[in-house]
Amino acid sequence: MSITKQELRREALQRLKAAALADPAQLRSATLRRKLAAVLGGDSRCVAIYAPLPHEINLLPLLREYPQHRYVFPLCLPGRQLQFRHVLSPERDLIPGAMNIPEPAAHTTIVPPEEIDILIVPGVAFTRNGARLGYGGGYYDRFIPRCTRARVLALAFEEQLVAEIPAEPHDLYIPELITPLT
């Protein structure tokens, strides 16, 4: 593959931002959240999600739509490590973090990776066979192996699907990808 990860990331972000302007991500997110409902099920689970950027899938309504689950959000730590924390109310428990991305406040409770049942991984681009292009920090590539019992998946808009992503030895594949058309 001749395109670099940086070039692919830039192109994918441009497509996502253009699509979000034409059709707000909130409206498109509802379709993917409905598909995710089958994965979540009715039993109480620990679900790792993330606060969305404007062009990303908005998972915050899950807290209201499926309140039986315990939702945990990532906090970026030094050394490009992630720590997940329990969030009851995004309005109260999330604060602006690095690059103004909402992250859990200091008063939230740390949740060990082995307690996570479902880990929803963000990304810029994906292939149908599970290759993932993130934002370039490798945070999730380091964190996923620590989630020993989690069902790992990603949600993606059609604009995020690409034929190929250049892979490096540390890059992990996402075993399950949910799109509007899958």
Predicted regions and their residues:
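Surface-exposed, charge/polar-rich loops and edge strands
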Residues: 1-7, 14-18, 68, 114-119, ...
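N-terminal active-site beta-alpha-beta segment that forms phosphate/nucleotide-binding
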Residues: 2-96, 100-114
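Short beta-strand segments
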Residues: 50-52, 74, 121-122, 154-156
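Short secondary-structure transition/capping segments
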Residues: 94-98, 121-130
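Short capping loops/turns at secondary-structure boundaries
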Residues: 109, 132-133
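Short polar/charged helix/loop
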Residues: 136
